[in-house]
Regions:
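Phosphate/NTP-binding elements of NTP-utilizing enzymes
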Residues: 1-155
Length: 157
């Protein structure tokens, strides 16, 4: 069952806004529904593009976002998903459409260099308040493809 707040996340791609900020309790399902909506939006609007999936660390991002997404039955039914752990890239295909979701960790002030120079069509930043400002600003700046959108989740610290 989808809650009214989760329905708003699913509707975000069709809004006039360029950014979504989700705030909610831990284990409320916001990250899972955001990732589903993020990938669905990317696959419906782009092909051959790169997207950022950002967490505090690459490992936490992999465990909390990538692995649950690849295990999601709806995702497995709709897409061909290939997770290349060594490259930190999840390749998602459906028909002639292929997009790449690159995982980044924003754990310290030097982390911005990991995303610097990339061109992204969108980014999802999970638990963004735990990331240094320099990393967040660099991720936002990298979203320079026309039509790019930002997806951010907050936690209370």
């Amino acid at each position: 069952m989808i809650s009214p707040k989760q329905a708003k996340i699913l509707a975000f791609p069709y809004s006039k806004y360029d950014a979504l900020i989700c705030d909610g309790a831990v284990r409320s399902g916001k990250t899972s529904i955001m990732m589903w909506a993020f990938v669905r939006w990317a696959m419906e609007n782009f092909s051959g593009q790169r997207f950022g999936v950002c967490g505090r660390t690459v490992d936490s991002c992999t465990k909390n976002i990538i692995v649950p997404f690849t295990a999601m039955s709806l995702a497995k039914e709709r897409y061909i998903i290939r997770w290349r752990r060594g490259d930190k890239v999840m390749e998602v295909r459906r028909g002639a459409v292929t997009n790449y979701f690159e995982v980044f960790g924003g754990k310290d002030e030097a982390s911005y260099t990991l995303i610097q120079g990339r061109t992204l069509a969108g980014a999802l930043l999970d638990e963004v308040v735990l990331m240094p400002r320099s990393f967040v600003e660099q991720a936002l700046t990298r979203c320079s493809v026309d039509g790019a959108k930002l997806w951010l989740s907050l936690i209370h610290i």
